[in-house]
């Protein structure tokens, strides 16, 4: 849990700030908060004692990456992280995460740290969700100290992954290997058109002669 504590402390000291906030939105054009969040993030930077890290999914449209990269360069306490880097490092350093409908939300909640989302589509929401970006700063203040928000995070940890022994990945791999031994590997995956398009754009098509 504390692998990145020294790096975090150094970053906060260099900026003279108290907390790190990670903005990690989804790449999906229909679900991403990127078109709406910049003004609210700038207000949060201006009014609260934070360093803001921006970490986007590798499949995020380049125009959004370019726009936020340029914006971050004009903000003394904003750091744009290239999408090729692993988000886990920055999740471990962050005190609060801002997102929308990214799966990274659940990863961060399991660290027992607060999440704020904009227009999340999840059926069950165990974090602070806003539908107006003007409420971002208010939501930030709430998630830090509100007892109900803290209890929701505790519930997620207890019910989704109560194991804190550092061996979750070992268990997951063992279960996956056991499933493959019993059921084999599916010949095809059922993907929607957008997932197919982004996968092909990123990784290319697989030649039939190269298939297992």
Pin down the residues of each PLM region.
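A donor-sugar binding/catalytic signature common to diverse glycosyltransferases
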Residues: 84-127
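Short, solvent-exposed loop/turn segments at secondary-structure junctions
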Residues: 26-30, 58-61, 103-104, 121-123, ...
